[in-house]
């Protein structure tokens, strides 16, 4: 992937994959491939959320108004 996708684009892609798998009308091989893509997207989304949370914590702590989020 030469250009990093935005969080919202990755989330939309994951939602499409989940919908496909929930419908159950895909071949086993395709379902496995889609599941793997979904897991990769899920990890990327979680990493993006973790990074955003750390950024917010730093900003809030620099202001002196907030402590570490859990």
Curated annotation (Swiss-Prot):
Catalytic activity: Exonucleolytic cleavage in either 5'- to 3'- or 3'- to 5'-direction to yield nucleoside 5'-phosphates
Top-level EC class as recorded in UniProt: hydrolase
Keywords: Cytoplasm, Exonuclease, Hydrolase, Nuclease
Gene Ontology molecular function: exodeoxyribonuclease VII activity
Lineage top rank: taxon: Bacteria
Major location (coarse): cytoplasm
Location(s) in or outside the cell: Cytoplasm
Annotated EC: 3.1.11.6
Nuclease in keyword set: yes
Pfam families: Exonuc_VII_S
GO biological process, one term: DNA catabolic process
Gene Ontology CC terms, in alphabetical order: cytosol; exodeoxyribonuclease VII complex
Family, similarity comment: Belongs to the XseB family.
Functional description taken from the UniProt entry: Bidirectionally degrades single-stranded DNA into large acid-insoluble oligonucleotides, which are then degraded further into small acid-soluble oligonucleotides.
UniProt-listed PANTHER family: EXODEOXYRIBONUCLEASE 7 SMALL SUBUNIT
Quaternary structure, from the entry: Heterooligomer composed of large and small subunits.
Protein name from the UniProt record: Exodeoxyribonuclease 7 small subunit
Organism: Streptococcus sanguinis (strain SK36)
């Amino acid at each position: 992937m030469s250009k990093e996708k935005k969080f919202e684009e990755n989330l939309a892609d994951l939602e499409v994959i989940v919908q496909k798998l929930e419908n159950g009308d895909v071949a086993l091989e395709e379902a496995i491939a889609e599941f793997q893509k979904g897991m990769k997207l899920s990890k990327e989304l979680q990493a993006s959320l973790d990074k955003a949370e750390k950024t917010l914590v730093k900003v809030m702590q620099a202001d002196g108004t907030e402590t570490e989020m859990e």
